[in-house]
Amino acid sequence: MDETNDSENKRVENWLRIRGFDLFAVMDPARWPEPLRESFRTLDINLPMGTRIVLLGSVGRTLWEIVRRDHWQDSDPIDRYSIRIVEELRKLHWHGQKIEWLHPGPCPIPIQRLCRQAGWSHPSLLGLDIHAQFGTWFACRAVIVVSRSIECTPRESSRSPCESCLEKPCRSHCPSGAVTDIEAFGLMACGSYRLAKESNCAHLCLSRLACPIGTSQRYSDVQLDYHGALSLTSLQAAREQAE
């Protein structure tokens, strides 16, 4: 391992952390399993040898509080803040290296599979991915292609916390019956219940709140309401388009 590049990654991690990004991963797509590489080829995303995929993620309330305090005047404030920070990172630490944006962006890249490849997460019964320490209270905020051989970060290693969770309170707290098995989340049942009149899951997920993993990182009520309202609007738009 190149110690210079490794120490540079440490500096980048520290720089990002104080700006609200606790998760940072650099991956070489040439080392990915073939199905993941194929998913990018299907999307006509070219990843030449030597390029890197970089992921930035947030945990808990830190990023939210920074954006609410200093950047809430922007439309799409979290995405815009994430883009701003990556551009600063590119100039300060990567010598203005050319980058390509994958997320935020219009292309439906497999974000969950990227997070799993980085070792950040595992599938859960909730349809969301789950981090072994932070539970479901994390999010991937940026995915970029960097045309520079940055040293890859070590892949996080962990077991799914769902495997050792015996009670699985997420099941009993789901009023729609959508939470049954990791391989069979009831997406349609969940969406239909959220859209129902007087649904108590419209802006939040009762099963998610019942999960015992990472409770110290639980989003604030205001944060939950904000993200819940956005996803509910998307659900309503999808239903109207289908009708």
Each model region followed by its residue ranges:
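Auxiliary alpha/beta "docking" domains used to position bulky ligands
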Residues: 1-164, 202-203, 218-243
